Design a protein with these regions (language model features):
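Short, surface-exposed basic-aromatic patches at helix termini and helix-loop junctions that form
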Residues: 45-54
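An anionic, glycine-rich sequence signature occurring as long contiguous blocks
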Residues: 54-160, 218, 247-252
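Acidic, metal-coordinating catalytic cores used for nucleic-acid/nucleotide bond scission
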Residues: 33-41, 61-63, 173
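Electropositive, glycine- and tryptophan-enriched low-complexity nucleic-acid-binding patches
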Residues: 1-27
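Short amphipathic alpha-helical "interface-anchor" segments enriched in bulky aromatics
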Residues: 138-177, 181, 185-193
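Short, conserved catalytic/metal-binding motifs centered on acidic residues
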Residues: 30-40, 55, 129, 151-158, ...
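A short, flexible helix-boundary coil/loop motif
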Residues: 188-252
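Glycine-rich, histidine-containing beta strand-loop boundary motifs that form or position
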Residues: 1-2, 35-36, 57-59
Length: 252
C-alpha cells in the first residue's frame, strides 16, 4: 500500500492490516502480529483483539508514560552482565485508548562499578511495548518484538541494491510504477538465486553477488552476427557462471 509521504502510517492502519490478511493464501492463519510505534491507536489494537490475534507493538515514550513507570519499584533483572536489562509490566491506559492494556517496559544500561547505576535514572534506556499476550514475561515479549528486525534487512538490501528509496519524478503514479519495477527485480533476483545458483551463493546480497560475478574484466565482441561476451581468464568463477547459464537456459 503506497501512500504519499505526508500521510502518517497510522492513518487507516486497520484497513491496511485487513487487506494484508485478505491477500494471504487460503487456509493461512495468522497467530501473532508485530508492529513499530508508527502503527498505533485504539482502532488498530481492537482490530487484532477482535480477531484473537496476539500482538506486540512499540509505544511512543511520553512524559505521561514515564511518570507511570517512575512509580514502579519492583523491576525484574533478566540480564546481569556488562549490559544490565530489567523489565516490569503494568496496566496502562493512554489518553486515546478506550480501555487499559498490558504494557511492558524494558530498560537497559551499561554496568558501572558496583550497582550505583540504579541511583541515576538518566543512565537507563527505556522501551515500552503494548501487548495482549497477558501470560508472557516482559523479556519474552521484548525479544519476540525484536525478531521483527529481520524484515529490516530485506528493506536495507532493497535500498542499497535496487534503490527503492530513490524518488525519480514528481508524479506519484510514475514513482509507484518505478517502485513496483524495483520490487519485481528484487523478487526475480531472489528466485534466480533459489533456482539457478549454487547453495553457497544463495545467501549473497545483490551487492555481494555483483562483486562476485558482474564486476569482472571482459570485452564484448561481435562475430558471425553474434554478440559475444569474453570474460577475462582470471575470473575464478567461470565454471560456476557456466552452471548458472545452463540452469537459466533450462528455465527458458
Amino acid at each position: 500500500d503506497l501512500r504519499p509521504g505526508n500521510r502518517h502510517c497510522s492513518r487507516d492502519a486497520a484497513a491496511f492490516a485487513e487487506e494484508t490478511l485478505r491477500l494471504l493464501p487460503a487456509g493461512r492463519r495468522v497467530k501473532f502480529a508485530r508492529f513499530d510505534k508508527g502503527f498505533a491507536g485504539e482502532d488498530f489494537y481492537q482490530f487484532w483483539e477482535q480477531r484473537k490475534i496476539g500482538y506486540v507493538g512499540k509505544l511512543k515514550w511520553t512524559d505521561r508514560l514515564a511518570r507511570e513507570v517512575a512509580n514502579c519499584r519492583h523491576w525484574t533483572r533478566y540480564v546481569d552482565e556488562d549490559v544490565i536489562i530489567e523489565g516490569i509490566r503494568l496496566i496502562y491506559k493512554a489518553t486515546s485508548w478506550n480501555k487499559a492494556r498490558l504494557v511492558i517496559v524494558i530498560r537497559k544500561a551499561e554496568r558501572y562499578d558496583g550497582d550505583q547505576l540504579q541511583m541515576y535514572d538518566f543512565l537507563w534506556e527505556y522501551e515500552a511495548i503494548v501487548s495482549n499476550l497477558l501470560d508472557w514475561d516482559p523479556i519474552d515479549i521484548w525479544r519476540f518484538y525484536n525478531q521483527r528486525a529481520c524484515v529490516e534487512n530485506h528493506i536495507k538490501e532493497a535500498k542499497q541494491g535496487f534503490s527503492i528509496h530513490r524518488i525519480p519524478t514528481g508524479s506519484f503514479k510514475v514513482n509507484e510504477l518505478d517502485l513496483l519495477l524495483k520490487v519485481m527485480a528484487y523478487n526475480v533476483f531472489e528466485r534466480f538465486k533459489a533456482d539457478c545458483c549454487e547453495p553457497v551463493d544463495r545467501r549473497h546480497t545483490i551487492t555481494r553477488f555483483r562483486q562476485e560475478f558482474f564486476r569482472v574484466a571482459g570485452v564484448i565482441v561481435s562475430h558471425s552476427r553474434q554478440v559475444i561476451l569474453r570474460i577475462a581468464e582470471s575470473f575464478n568463477k567461470q565454471h560456476v557462471w557456466k552452471r548458472m547459464e545452463t540452469r537459466v537456459a533450462q528455465i527458458t
